[in-house]
């Protein structure tokens, strides 16, 4: 558990350092054509702050409830026999949710990062001459791989140290003194070795699931705050209106994916509901924050574009890596699906369905 907490903190610090360091590159961006930036804002007839504020007030509880339902459903699945961890339906639900998370990274977060970091509000050099969005996404994915591998390495070292310790026999001695002791050890050694191997594999898998759940939540939370902030700061009633339904579905399905990861991690009840709480409130919090700073927040300012673009790129790297490596690959190359061709096909159908549904949402959110 200590290693998963360390991974969570290290990833958070890395993203924060990136987002506060890179804005310094915007020093020359103030020379960008402001009028050209403002021209990107869209239909002026939709700009009605009073109407937009009313819609935002409706959006906050709606998105909060949708988020809570989505992330909580998998946690209650233990009481539903058909959704038990050993049932086929559980695998289908997990692959569906994994497809949703993959599409979130590719179809929602990464394009937003491209839009921000290639905006005409930023100077051509260096922002138009180097693909910062994909570069940061790649670095983010590699950092997640590095953190996860170091965590597992640290766990393996700790386990090997424990195995090297001398365990006293029942008589208190550290050595085998009698023929009876030798016979007892020979008869029981095979069973003990197998049992220790099973326990070690289970513990290692559990640690891996904890790391996955925490890093996945981090990527989703960063993205959710950014979405909420943009919505809260907007005075475009047309944009806000279309976002309400889209974000409700977005948070519902994304929450199901996160909830499945939290369930597999087998956290304590307090940790489960803490993670549920943070996922549920991040988008509404972002909306409230955006409303509070609406008068001073300029989404076309160089600093805002770079900070939001970097955060989106980092989040995209986290989500894409997690969906492909830790969720889909783990599921499809596991013995449960590999030994069942029908489940194999259904798993892919569910994955493509989840990805297609979330991709369709990209039209509105």
Swiss-Prot record:
Q: Which residues lie on this side of the membrane: Extracellular?
A: 27-56, 112-129, 232-242, 294-304
- What membrane topology does the UniProt entry give? Multi-pass membrane protein
GO molecular function terms listed in the Swiss-Prot or TrEMBL record: zinc ion transmembrane transporter activity
Cell cycle keyword on record: no
Keyword Oxidoreductase carried by entry: no
Instruction: Identify its protein family.
Output: Belongs to the ZIP transporter (TC 2.A.5) family.
What is the documented function of this protein?
Probably mediates zinc uptake from the rhizosphere.
What is the name of this protein?
Answer: Zinc transporter 7
> Which species expresses this protein natively?
Arabidopsis thaliana
């Amino acid at each position: 558990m200590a290693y998963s907490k360390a991974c969570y903190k290290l990833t958070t610090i890395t993203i924060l350092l990136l987002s506060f360091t890179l804005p310094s590159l915007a020093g020359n961006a103030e020379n960008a054509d402001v009028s050209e930036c403002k021209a990107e804002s869209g239909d002026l007839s939709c700009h009605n702050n009073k109407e937009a504020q009313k819609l935002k007030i409706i959006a906050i509880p709606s998105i909060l409830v949708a988020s809570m339902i989505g992330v909580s459903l998998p946690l209650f699945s233990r009481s539903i026999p058909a959704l038990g961890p050993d049932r086929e339906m559980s695998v289908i639900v997990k692959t569906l949710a994994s497809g949703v998370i993959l599409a979130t990274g590719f179809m929602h977060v990464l394009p937003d990062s491209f839009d921000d970091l290639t905006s005409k509000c930023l100077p051509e050099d260096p922002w138009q001459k180097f693909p910062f969005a994909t570069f940061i996404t790649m670095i983010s994915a590699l950092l997640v791989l590095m953190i996860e591998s170091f965590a597992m390495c640290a766990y393996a070292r700790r386990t090997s140290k424990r195995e090297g310790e001398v365990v006293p026999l029942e008589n208190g001695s550290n050595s085998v003194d009698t023929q009876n002791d030798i016979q007892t050890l020979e008869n029981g050694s095979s069973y003990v070795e197998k049992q220790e191997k099973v326990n070690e594999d289970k513990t290692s898998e559990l640690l891996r699931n904890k790391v996955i759940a925490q890093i996945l939540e981090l990527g989703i939370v960063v993205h959710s705050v950014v979405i909420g902030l943009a919505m809260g700061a907007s005075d475009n009633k047309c944009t806000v209106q279309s976002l309400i339904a889209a974000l409700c579905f977005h948070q519902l399905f994304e929450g199901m994916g996160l909830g499945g990861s939290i369930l597999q991690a087998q956290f304590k009840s307090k940790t489960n509901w803490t993670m549920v709480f943070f996922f549920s409130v991040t988008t509404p919090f972002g909306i409230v924050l955006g409303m509070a700073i609406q008068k001073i927040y300029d989404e076309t300012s160089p600093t805002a574009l770079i900070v939001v673009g970097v955060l989106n790129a980092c989040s995209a790297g986290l989500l894409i890596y997690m969906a492909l490596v830790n969720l889909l690959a783990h599921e499809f190359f596991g013995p449960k699906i590999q030994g069942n061709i029908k489940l194999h096909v259904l798993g892919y159908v569910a994955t493509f369905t989840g990805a297609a549904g979330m991709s369709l949402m990209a039209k509105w959110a």
